Regions:
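C-terminal motif of bacterial Sec signal peptides marking the signal peptidase cleavage site
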Residues: 21-22
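An exposed acidic His-Trp-rich patch
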Residues: 130-173
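Short, conserved catalytic or interaction motifs in soluble domains
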Residues: 25
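Positively charged n-region of N-terminal signal peptides that target proteins for export
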Residues: 1-4
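N-terminal low-complexity, Pro/Thr/Ser-rich intrinsically disordered segments
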Residues: 28-40, 44
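Glycine-rich, compositionally biased intrinsically disordered regions
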Residues: 43-141
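Bacterial N-terminal signal peptides
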Residues: 9-18
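Conserved small/polar residues in nucleotide/adenosyl-binding loops
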Residues: 174-180
Length: 181
């Protein structure tokens, strides 16, 4: 019996030593990225996200109204310029002095917005920008257009042309020149 007890005690001691050494073993840490990699990642995140933050701030400023403020309109409604831009105009960089502008912030997250561009004998176009301020489309011919997200599934009325834009937040700028004399 003493022999069995001695063997069991020896095995228990060896097992305990093995468990203790396993518990105290150094754990391997994942490699820490170098400063250059961290800087590149942060720079890419900034370049990607900053336009989205700036667009959202601009949208909030431009649409924070009940519709009675000059120069602002609620989402999915037009803000039509009441006069031509002059030297004091600072909202858009280098606006044309012979062009009347309209702006609308669109939310197409649930359904498209239909935009009707009438026939005109003057220069007129509608520039659609995505949330990164990239031009997603330019409408320059008379017609009815449905501005939609690429994944939207639904039927459009006859005669309506679908225009896909990549983000649910879209801003439209309509440019209409004055008649020539």
């Amino acid at each position: 019996m003493k022999k069995i007890f001695a063997i069991l005690l020896s095995l228990l001691t060896l097992l305990s030593c093995g468990l203790l050494s396993a518990c105290s073993a150094k754990k391997t840490q994942p490699d820490t990225p170098d400063t250059e990699t961290v800087w590149e990642t942060v720079s890419e995140a900034y370049i990607y996200a900053f336009p989205l933050v700036l667009t959202d701030a601009t949208k909030t400023l431009s649409t924070n109204t009940d519709g009675t403020m000059t120069g602002r309109a609620p989402i999915n409604q037009f803000n039509h310029a009441k006069k031509l831009a002059d030297a004091s105009f600072r909202t858009v960089v280098t606006p044309n002095v012979d062009t009347v502008y309209s702006q609308a912030w669109l939310d197409i997250s649930t359904e498209p917005m239909v935009y009707v561009l009438p026939e005109t004998d003057r220069f007129c176009n509608v520039q659609l920008l995505d949330a990164w301020t990239n031009t997603a489309a330019v409408l320059d011919k008379a017609g009815a257009y449905a501005i939609a997200l690429p994944g939207w599934e639904g039927e459009l009325p006859d005669g309506v042309t679908r225009v896909d834009v990549p983000t649910a937040t879209t801003v439209s700028y309509t440019h209409l020149t004055l008649p020539t004399t």
